[in-house]
Curated annotation (Swiss-Prot):
Name assigned to this protein: Protein FAM90A13
Lineage, uppermost ranks: Eukaryota, Metazoa, Chordata, Craniata, Vertebrata
InterPro entries documented for this protein: FAM90, Znf-CCHC_6
Low complexity: compositionally biased ranges: 180-197
Annotated PANTHER family: FAMILY WITH SEQUENCE SIMILARITY 90 MEMBER A11, PSEUDOGENE-RELATED (PTHR16035:SF14), PROTEIN FAM90A1 (PTHR16035)
Pfam families on file: zf-CCHC_6
Family: Belongs to the FAM90 family.
Misc. comment: Primate-specific FAM90A gene family, thought to have arisen during multiple duplication and rearrangement events.
Bias (Basic and acidic residues) ranges: 74-89, 97-114
């Protein structure tokens, strides 16, 4: 029985068993398609095409020789230029180009007629023909010959204004200048006066805006009218007696010999002109010996805008005249002063030269004269003027342009020979030197005394 079995059949069975085992060991999943088949669900990672994987031999990235150029799906005539590198020549134009050429030749023939009509109506010269002398059939000819001027935009040039706008801007500028010129007339007048006048008349010209005081004479006795250039309420009016007393003492120490030669004359300064214009009837009389008098009535000053304050080196004219006329010992108000109002300042004692600081520290002519007051009259008292000397007058005139001009005049003498001792009887404190004849003071002496007083005031302010 064993011999009847065929060995070939046994071998076939082993091959079948091995194939079954291989099939069982294989993983469960989709089976790879054969190489001839393409699966659209697959995508190659190398070339990005669908239908094969990166391991397939159909991928063109692995075998370039087998790669084929992808063909189009279908031809679309009339939308694609199959041969763009071959431009059509002018020798053999196509049918479409022939039609276009005929349409272009027709309007070109009408151009000369149009140009002639335009030349007749507009008067412009005819355009010159092209130098080549043949019609331009190239498509880029319209770029070479422009039909009209092209606008050129530049940022460097400024646009021109209309004449109406220019006139308006000019009127606005002139209006602004006139408004600025009319804003501060006080400041303009003070600047023009200070620039035109000399060093002697600058500070007097600064008071051109204040009203000019009038000289008031009561009875036979002339009064000294002093107008300070810079008025200040309360504090500014109280500084005047102190400067007056200080100047009297300095002048006494500087010129002791002049006091021996000249008699002591009692002079009465008139109150400032603002009291007359405001209607105040109070008289101010200051003594030369005291630093500050007793409570004097405060002058009602006009509050002008932006006026500089009275400096320490500026000396009123009333203090200067008192020292020039012989250093009066006491000041007694005349009977005419009682008519204006009660005098509240008491009589001050004489200040000795020992109490006055020396003036030899500074030369007298080191600084030019800076007068700060405008004196209308400068005269001796009529009771003491026995030699016939005439008083001095300073005349101030206001010009058309707002400036001031001053001139020194000799006024007629105010003598009272009928009653030579009338005023001397009323003032019991007059010294024995008043019996001597009065000596006339020349203007040069007054100018030197004013320089001495200004230099001494500067030295005192520096020491303080």
């Amino acid at each position: 029985m064993m011999a009847r079995r065929d060995p070939t059949s046994w071998a076939k069975r082993l091959v079948r068993a091995q194939t079954l085992q291989k099939q069982r060991r294989a993983p469960v999943g989709p089976r790879a398609p054969p190489p001839d088949e393409e699966d659209p669900r697959l995508k190659c990672k190398n070339c990005g095409a669908f239908g094969h994987t990166a391991r397939s031999t159909r991928c063109p990235m692995k075998c370039w020789k087998a790669a084929l150029v992808p063909a189009t799906l279908g031809k679309k005539e009339g939308k694609e230029n199959l041969k763009p590198w071959k431009p059509r020549g002018e020798a053999n134009p196509g049918p479409l180009n022939k039609d276009k050429g005929e349409k272009e030749e027709r309007p070109r023939q009408q151009d000369p007629q149009r140009k002639a009509l335009l030349h007749m109506f507009s008067g412009k010269p005819p355009e010159k023909p092209l130098p080549n002398g043949k019609g331009s059939t190239e498509p880029s000819d319209y770029l070479r010959v422009a039909s009209g001027p092209m606008p050129v935009h530049t940022t460097s040039k400024r646009p021109r204004l209309d004449p109406v706008l220019a006139d308006r801007s000019a009127t606005e500028m002139s209006g602004r200048g006139s408004v600025l010129a009319s804003l501060s007339p006080l400041r303009k007048a003070s600047l023009s006066s200070s620039s035109s006048l000399g060093p002697k008349e600058r500070q007097t010209g600064a008071a051109a805006d204040m009203p000019q005081p009038a000289v008031r004479h009561q009875g036979r006795e002339p009064l000294l009218v002093v107008k300070p250039t810079h008025s200040r309420p309360e504090g500014g009016c109280r500084e005047v007696p102190q400067a007056a007393s200080k100047t009297h003492g300095l002048l006494q120490a500087a010129r002791p010999q002049a006091q021996d030669k000249r008699p002591a004359v009692t002079s009465q300064p008139c109150p400032p002109a603002a009291t007359h214009s405001l209607g105040l009837g109070s008289n101010l009389s200051f003594g030369p010996g005291a630093k500050r008098p007793a409570q004097a009535p405060i002058q009602a000053c006009l509050n002008f805008p932006k006026k500089p304050r009275l400096g320490p080196f500026q000396i009123p004219e009333s203090a200067i005249q008192g020292g020039e006329l012989g250093a009066p010992e006491n000041l007694q108000p005349p009977p005419a002063a009682t008519e204006l109002g009660p005098s509240t300042s008491p009589q001050m004692g004489r200040r000795t030269p020992a109490q006055v600081p020396s003036v030899d520290r500074q030369p007298p002519h080191s600084r030019p004269c800076l007068p700060t007051a405008q004196a209308c009259t400068m005269s001796h008292h009529p009771a003491a003027s026995h030699d016939g000397a005439q008083p001095l007058r300073v005349l101030f005139r206001r010009l058309e342009n707002g400036r001031w001009s001053s001139s020194l005049l000799a006024a007629p003498s105010f003598h009272s020979p009928e009653k030579p001792g009338a005023f001397l009887a009323q003032s019991p404190h007059v010294s024995e030197k008043s019996e001597a004849p009065c000596v006339r003071v020349p203007p040069s002496v007054l100018y030197e005394d004013l320089q001495v007083s200004s230099s001494s005031e500067d030295s005192d302010s520096d020491l303080e």
